[in-house]
């Protein structure tokens, strides 16, 4: 399977590799075909290829809401996503706020929403939010105290859930 995938990854048309989505789709089709032909699950094929075993425990899957962060967060909560929502916070004015207020309100809403919609009090997703350097953009990439204070505010807004912030600043 890896051999097939490596050879497919190198196919070029007009001197360019095929688009990532095409390569991904074909690799999934190959994996699915190998699994079905050998009466195994796709995860078993991957485990065999890499000399490992299939996990007995659920693996936390990272989810991504895109710009429809409110509706998609609801879907993630109802499906029990372990890591959510990514949120695509890539614009200061529209998504973060000039003082970070838009994101802070969203994190508060997210915490309240999980507590309202979850079916099990043990459901404690990790909030993972990618901010694409926008926190550094509003506070200044050298203003570590202000960024740290804001991150602490976000952490408080997320309680009782854990919060991960991806890419707080571009340096």
Regions from the PLM with identified roles:
Residues 1, 20, 52-53, 63, ...:
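Residue-identity detector for threonine
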Residues 1-40:
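Metal- or metallocofactor-binding catalytic centers and their adjacent structured scaffolds
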Residues 15, 50-51, 70:
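Generic structural signal for short, flexible, solvent-exposed coil/loop and linker residues
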Residues 28-29, 42-48, 65-68:
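Short alpha-helical segments and helix-capping/turn motifs at coil-helix boundaries
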Residues 31, 43-45, 135, 146-147:
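Broad hydrophobic/π-residue packing in well-ordered secondary structure
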Residues 34-38, 42-47, 51-55:
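Extended, Lys/Arg-enriched charged tracts that mediate electrostatic binding to polyanionic substrates
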Residues 56-171:
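Metal-dependent enolase-superfamily TIM-barrel catalytic cores that perform enediolate-based chemistry
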């Amino acid at each position: 399977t890896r051999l097939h995938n490596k050879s497919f990854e190198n196919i070029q048309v007009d001197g360019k590799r095929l688009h990532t989505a095409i390569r991904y789709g074909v690799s999934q089709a190959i994996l699915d075909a190998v699994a079905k032909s050998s009466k195994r699950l796709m995860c078993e094929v991957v485990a065999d290829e890499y000399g490992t075993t299939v996990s007995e425990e659920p693996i936390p899957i990272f989810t991504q809401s895109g710009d429809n962060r409110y509706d998609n967060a609801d879907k993630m909560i109802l499906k029990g996503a372990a890591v959510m929502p990514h949120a695509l916070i890539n614009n200061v004015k529209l998504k973060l706020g000039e003082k970070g207020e838009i994101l802070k309100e969203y994190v508060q809403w997210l915490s309240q929403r999980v507590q309202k919609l979850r079916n099990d009090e043990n459901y404690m997703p990790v909030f993972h939010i990618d901010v694409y350097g926008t926190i550094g953009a509003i506070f200044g990439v050298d203003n570590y105290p202000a960024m740290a204070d804001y991150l602490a505010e976000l952490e408080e807004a997320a309680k009782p859930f854990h919060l991960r912030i991806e890419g707080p600043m571009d340096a």
